Amino acid sequence: MNIIVNGGSRGIGKEVVLYLAQDINNHIIVTGRNKKALNRLSSSCANVHTVSVDLSVLNKQSETFKKKILNHFKRVDVLINIAGILVAKEFMKIEDDEARLMMETNFFGPASVIRIVQPLMQDGAHIVNISSMGGYQGSEKFKGLSHYSASKAAIACLSECLAEEFRNSGISVNCLALGAVQTEMLEEAFPGYKAPVNAKEIARFISYFALEGHKFINGKIIPVAVNNP
């Protein structure tokens, strides 16, 4: 199985890579901004390859990114878009560049990755986009997460649309809207907050869903939370 984990240098993405890499039949490309963290991953797992990329400027580096992917894979079976950034500020206090960075990283970057990778996918392939309960319609909302939630709502809606656009190609697209998970990103945004689920636990669920979920589900936004957010 050829798998790309977009955003795997730390947190949930890293745990997904480590879990999937336990199966030697899985060959994984992991992308991220932190080159040192990526190198540590590839050094510890023989079936993991790394591609350093800044999603906020991927539109300017798309050809370079595609060449790096093609150096390892001619076919992609699974794409998991986990990359994300969170700036916890209320709507009237957030700076324009902070808001744009979240939208570039959480929406436009993953969308660009899909556009680059999709031609390498065949019938039976699966794209899994990771969203948030903050971007899940009808869920409880929280102060300081307006732009973050909007960016996650965007990737969720895109998932529904792409499932229809890619249907004739046999490529499934689903979205997991995660509740709070204990990660570095959460701790940095909300010091002292304790989530009910840790990164390793949710990584096992994401990995299983990425490999098997498309056999039963397509074009769905699935809430994965024991509480809100």
Q: Which residues does each PLM region occupy?
A:
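Conserved NAD(P)H cofactor-binding loop of Rossmann-fold oxidoreductase domains
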Residues: 82-87
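Rossmann-fold cofactor-recognition segment
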Residues: 45-59
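Conserved glycine-rich Rossmann-like NAD(P)H-binding loop of the short-chain dehydrogenase/reductase
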Residues: 24-40
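Conserved glycine-rich cofactor-binding loop
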Residues: 9-10
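Substrate-binding pocket helix/loop in short-chain dehydrogenase/reductase
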Residues: 90-91, 98-100
